[in-house]
From Swiss-Prot:
Signal peptide: none annotated. It comes from Tobacco yellow dwarf virus (strain Australia). A motif (RCR-2) lies at residues 61-63. This is Replication-associated protein A. A motif (RCR-1) lies at residues 19-22.
Length: 295
């Protein structure tokens, strides 16, 4: 029993903007332009652009954009066939984008005047636009997408959150101080700290200048601090100083001189004060004087 003949797909082209592609076409762009211009004259054709593009094997194929003044109603699938070359036929939804695409290599010929036309947005685009324009917060934006486009919400949530942050940038948090203004006030005795640290001559620094023992250096510094405080034993007009290379007044030694702590220009922290007024020497430290002896 013979098989029933297969039904051919019905063809119908209803549009004012047509995009044709002739693969491996042996005809020239000029022949195709003239052929289509004549064939579409009943639809009041006003623009046509044809571009030639080469395949990797060197054979050409032709792209064609057609703009009509009247909507076509073509039912014959072979309507655009030229010399045995059958094209791929599509409506050109956006003539400007099609013309830009076929002109990318610059090998294009045209006839007539190109006209931009309004491109009707898809229903999906309209729904997205409504969400973008009506949402008032990031949460509402994502909820609306979840309702309208659940598949996109489930598979592209990371990108949707990115767009939500662009539409509704996070507001910076107001800084709340964890301390009061009173905490910023300095309560330390800076003068005492200055005297004990900035104007302080250490035992080690003193011994770098004077060849004395650790005990002698300690004793000398305590004695100099006492002298600086009461201004005794210094020449008139000489300011007190604990500089390690100063000319130090000579003094007599006693066991009490080794007591106390090392101090600087601040208040004396000696555990005992000298009661004997020392004699002065213009060339040696107190310890050096004691080492040289006296007659």
């Amino acid at each position: 029993m013979p098989s029933a003949p297969q039904k051919t797909k019905s063809f119908r082209l209803q549009t004012k903007y047509v995009f044709l592609t002739y693969p491996r076409c042996s005809s020239s762009a000029e022949n195709l332009r003239d052929f289509l211009w004549d064939k579409l004259s009943r639809f009041a054709i006003f623009f046509i652009a044809i571009a030639t593009e080469l395949h990797q094997d060197g054979t050409p194929h032709l792209h064609c954009l057609i703009q009509l003044d009247k909507r076509s109603n073509i039912r014959d699938p072979s309507f655009f066939d030229l010399e045995g070359n059958h094209p791929n036929i599509q409506p050109a939804k956006n003539s400007e984008q099609v013309l830009e695409y076929i002109s990318k290599d610059g090998n294009v010929i045209t006839k007539g005047e190109f006209k931009k036309h309004r491109v009707s947005p898809s229903k999906s685009d309209e729904r997205w636009r409504t969400i973008i324009q009506t949402a008032t917060s990031k949460e509402e934006y994502l909820d609306m997408i979840k309702d309208e486009f659940p598949h996109e919400w489930a598979t592209k949530l990371q990108w949707l959150e990115y767009s939500a942050n662009k539409l509704f940038p996070p507001q910076p948090e107001i800084y709340q101080a964890t301390f009061t203004e009173e905490d910023l006030q300095c309560h330390e005795d800076l003068q005492l700290w200055r005297d004990q640290h900035l104007y302080h001559v250490s035992v080690d620094a003193y011994r770098l200048v004077h060849n004395v023992t650790l005990v002698e250096a300690h004793s000398d510094l305590v004695w100099m601090d006492d002298i600086s405080r009461n201004l005794e034993g210094l020449e008139p007009g000489s300011p007190p100083s604990t500089s390690a290379d100063q000319v130090v007044p000579e003094r007599q030694h006693g066991p009490e001189a080794s007591e106390g702590t090392i101090t600087g220009m601040g208040p004396s922290t000696s555990l005992s004060m000298m009661t004997t007024r020392p004699t002065t020497s213009s060339t040696t430290s107190p310890s050096n004087s004691s080492h040289s002896g006296s007659n």
